[in-house]
Regions:
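ABC family nucleotide-binding domain
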Residues: 2-222
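Absolute protein N-terminus
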Residues: 1-2, 243
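C-terminal boundary and immediately downstream tail of ABC-type ATPase nucleotide-binding domains
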Residues: 212-213, 217-219, 223-243
Length: 243
């Protein structure tokens, strides 16, 4: 059974339909790179998988749990589904340690000492162990994004969703964050990433999904799809982002 099963989902904001009959399955350990123009439905798709946005038709399951079932405890589900946005969303008045340990202590009832050790471990994974007691204002944008990733990893999720996590960063800081994503990928984490980083998608993506006007327009193995796009829409998109 796939870890993520998305079947024929549709999503509208008022009269505007942003997802149209979208279906996708993601196996455990797969890395899916979702690409496409702004407004194609990429970010909305991630938010639906996490249960942050309701759908009007179809179904979404994560590890056998139906996300769109009214009986589903979404807070419990989100312990298994981490999501990192392009805005870092760190609490400015809390230290890095407290930002990371807040959810494990409150949601998973971890002891403070245990939660702090997990925080230290995930910060080590993102190369920021020495920033354990720093505050967000003392960090660069790239460091803040790495802390945001560490915060999600601290919940030990089965699935990680990344929504254009490098788009607000300067090129040199983008490299820092991509190295962390590469490390998470190499650890075997199942990931769905909305990204414009085609090099990352080519090297680490199991598959690439190209969204266009609310639909999955083209899908395939990452290297092959990016090297030989079949549709004019994908060819045009790749020409724009690669040059």
């Amino acid at each position: 059974m796939s870890l993520v099963e998305i079947h024929a989902i549709s999503k509208s904001y008022g009269a505007v339909q942003v997802l149209k009959d979208v279906s996708l399955e993601v196996a455990k350990g797969e890395i899916i790179a979702v690409i496409g123009r702004s407004g194609s439905g990429k970010s909305t798709l991630l938010r639906c998988v996490n249960g942050l946005e309701p759908i009007q038709a179809g179904s979404i399951s994560v590890d056998g749990v139906k996300v769109n079932d009214p009986k589903t405890d979404l807070r419990k589900l989100r312990q298994q589904v981490g999501i990192v946005f392009q805005s870092f969303n760190l609490f400015p008045h809390l230290s890095v340690s407290d930002n990371i340990t807040l959810a494990p202590r409150v949601v998973k009832k971890q002891a403070p000492g245990e939660a702090r050790e997990i925080a230290r471990d995930v910060l080590r994974r993102v190369g920021l162990e020495e920033k354990l007691d720093a505050f967000p204002s003392q960090l660069s944008g790239g460091q803040q994004q790495r802390v945001a990733i560490a915060r999600s990893l601290a919940m030990q999720p089965k699935l990680m969703l990344f929504d254009e996590v490098t788009s607000a960063l300067d090129p040199e800081l983008t490299g820092e964050v991509l190295k962390v994503l590469e490390s998470v990928a190499q650890d075997g984490m199942t990931m769905i990433l909305v990204t414009h980083e085609m090099g990352f998608a080519r090297r680490f993506g199991s598959r690439v999904v190209f969204m266009h006007e609310g639909r999955i327009h083209e899908e395939g193995q990452a290297a092959a799809l990016l090297a030989e796009p079949k549709t004019p829409e994908l060819k045009t998109f790749l020409s724009a982002v690669l040059h």
